[in-house]
Design a protein with these regions (language model features):
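Small cysteine-rich, disulfide-bonded extracellular modules of the LU/uPAR three-finger superfamily
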Residues: 1-63, 67-102
Length: 102
């Protein structure tokens, strides 16, 4: 079974490897602002990104890109940004867990 040190190493590796975030409008990907990557009190790695498109649009996906340029996480959303919205906050939570298989 993994030790607490191993779990901490996995969490910190995720923190180090997430390099940027993107969102998609239609079929076009745009970079968004990566606000923070933290380990919460519940030992969840939380990655927050802020989307500011500048004009009304419908955002249909968000994703996280590793420092190697690989997509590490992606999720479908359906958020309409109107003129009254300045930005959209999205986050990904990663819970590292172990289970024993008999």
């Amino acid at each position: 079974m993994l030790t607490n040190a191993a779990f901490n190493d996995f969490r910190n590796m995720i923190k180090r490897m997430i390099a940027r975030a993107q969102y998609r409008v239609g079929s076009t990907w745009y970079d968004s602002t990566l606000l923070e990557t933290v380990i919460t009190g519940d030992n969840i790695v939380r990655v927050k990104t802020q989307i500011a498109h500048g004009s009304p649009c419908t955002i249909n996906r968000v994703r996280l890109i590793s420092s190697n340029g690989d997509v590490w996480a992606e999720k479908a959303i359906n958020v309409i940004l109107e003129n009254s919205y300045t930005h959209l906050l999205q986050w990904f939570d990663f819970n590292i867990a172990e289970s024993e298989v008999n």
